[in-house]
Regions:
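Glycine-rich, acidic/polar active-site loops that bind/position phosphate-bearing ligands
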Residues: 2-460
Length: 460
């Protein structure tokens, strides 16, 4: 097994990356960046091209932000399309993201991001903009993602042959936190844990969850960009590990009506300029500082406007229904898993908020940018969150302003008209991203569902 990718005391530089490849026998490296949906798109690059790209960058067709997750071209975006003839966009390699791929003989792997004008529509760059804003306000972000995902005894071919019906789960039934299940499948668990450690994506906890074949993984906390990088790497290479074992993993928000949806919760905290918690106040009943109250209040206030950046697929809205461990309104509580935001009293080192509305299928960079941007907005405007929700939020009635959009289309319209969104993320980003979500809903509307056939075919 490969040794873990070491996190150097000083950032891993372009010179370090060049030296690493020069002193190796590798003829190629692998590079990748995410599209709007959070899918890693990349290629093998020769060492000579890599050396040049480290210094000058390289070109990638800007279709990477001009198509959907099925490579269908958007027809409603201004940034790129047939009207621009899909030119190349400049890309920079990020040497500090270097990993070694253990299943490719430790091949060097680097994340990248769009640069120059293309930064305006680059998911990773949008997060970086929010982190720069936080730094300008005297804060740094610590974040940790946790994911639920279903595992199947299927292959990409078999699920298509079955038309995604009657799939065989890795394990049957409800059996959360099962020692039996993780012992029987210990080889798979250890391969996942070991691979992620080698990819500098340490898993703090891995266990079965509620549902057949469903697992939950908690990724170790890190700085903002590094946390989102790890989340992206975790999702991609979990699917790689599964398929290399003739299995499949899905991070779809809700793949079946019979089971709860899959979350991608984010734990977040801010540190001040001295590296101390900006969220903790031991004198407060909930140990919340004024900064934390304002941060949570901003998230509560803006979540309805930013939901398209949080629930990014049509399917994600099937998860946001009562009784399935997912929030249904923009609310907060202390140690309350029925609200959108869960404040966790963790003392001076781990006082934090859990952003529970996040779905597993969301782009980590976009969702973290939305969550952070909303919180910073609350701090800037000294918003107050009101009283925390106590008890079961599903059984309570809340003000209309806390209601969440019910469809992706409605969420995209809220985002387009959001002044805070345009102020935080820029007009170019809001217009481009909202258009991609409108496209996604339009594609969905072209298809007839099984529910419609069963309900209307004979009776209506």
């Amino acid at each position: 097994m490969a040794q873990p990718t070491a996190r150097a005391a000083a950032p891993f530089t372009a010179a370090d990356a060049r030296k690493l490849v020069e002193e190796s026998d590798f003829s190629h490296v692998k590079v990748a960046l995410t599209d709007v949906d959070g899918i890693l798109r990349g290629k093998y690059m020769s060492r000579e091209k890599f050396f040049s790209a480290l210094e000058k960058g390289f070109a990638f067709c800007d279709v990477i932000v001009g198509w959907d997750n099925n490579d269908q071209l958007y027809d409603n975006t201004r940034y790129t399309g047939w009207h621009t003839a899909y030119p190349d966009a400049p890309v920079r390699i990020l040497p500090e993201t270097m990993r070694r791929l253990p299943f490719e003989n430790d091949l060097p792997f680097f994340l990248c991001e769009l640069s120059d004008q293309a930064e305006a529509v680059c998911p990773r760059a949008i997060l970086r903009r929010m982190l720069d804003k936080a730094e300008g306000m005297g804060f740094s972000l610590k974040a940790a993602f946790e994911y639920e995902f279903f595992m199947f005894d299927e292959t990409p071919h078999s699920v298509r042959e079955k038309n995604y019906r009657n799939l065989t789960s890795l394990t049957p039934g409800f059996f959360g936190y099962s020692v039996l299940r993780n012992s029987v499948w210990s080889d798979l668990y250890h391969e996942l844990l070991g691979t992620m450690q080698a990819l500098d994506c340490e898993i703090e906890g891995l266990h079965t969850e509620t549902g057949p074949g469903v697992l939950e993984a908690a990724i170790a906390v890190d700085d903002g960009l590094a946390a989102a990088d790890k989340a992206t790497i975790f999702k991609t290479f979990t699917k790689v590990i599964a398929q290399r074992n003739n299995l499949m993993a899905t991070f779809m928000s809700k793949w079946s009506n019979a089971w709860p949806g899959q979350s991608g919760h984010i734990h977040m905290s801010l540190l001040d300029a001295k590296g101390k918690s900006a969220f903790h106040d031991p004198k407060d009943p909930h140990e919340m500082s004024a900064t934390m109250r304002h941060f949570v209040a901003g998230q509560v206030a803006l979540l309805p406007e930013f939901l398209a950046m949080v629930a990014q697929t049509v399917n994600a809205y099937s998860r946001l229904i009562p009784g399935y461990w997912a929030p249904t309104s923009s609310t907060w509580g202390v140690e309350n898993r029925t609200t959108a935001l869960r404040v966790i009293k963790g003392g001076p080192k781990s006082q934090r908020v859990e952003f529970r509305i996040a779905a597993a299928d969301a782009n980590p960079y976009i969702i973290l940018a939305a969550a952070l941007g909303a919180g910073l907005w609350g701090i800037e405007h000294k918003l107050e969150p009101g009283a925390p929700v106590k008890g079961n939020a599903y059984d309570k009635t809340f003000p209309r302003k806390t209601e969440l959009p019910r469809t992706l289309w409605d969420a995209a319209q809220r985002l387009k008209t959001s002044k805070p969104a345009r102020s935080l993320f820029g007009d170019d980003w809001v217009d481009h991203y909202a258009a991609t979500r409108e496209w996604e809903e339009r594609e969905f509307r072209k298809h007839i569902t099984d529910w419609e056939l069963a309900r209307y075919f004979e009776i209506i």
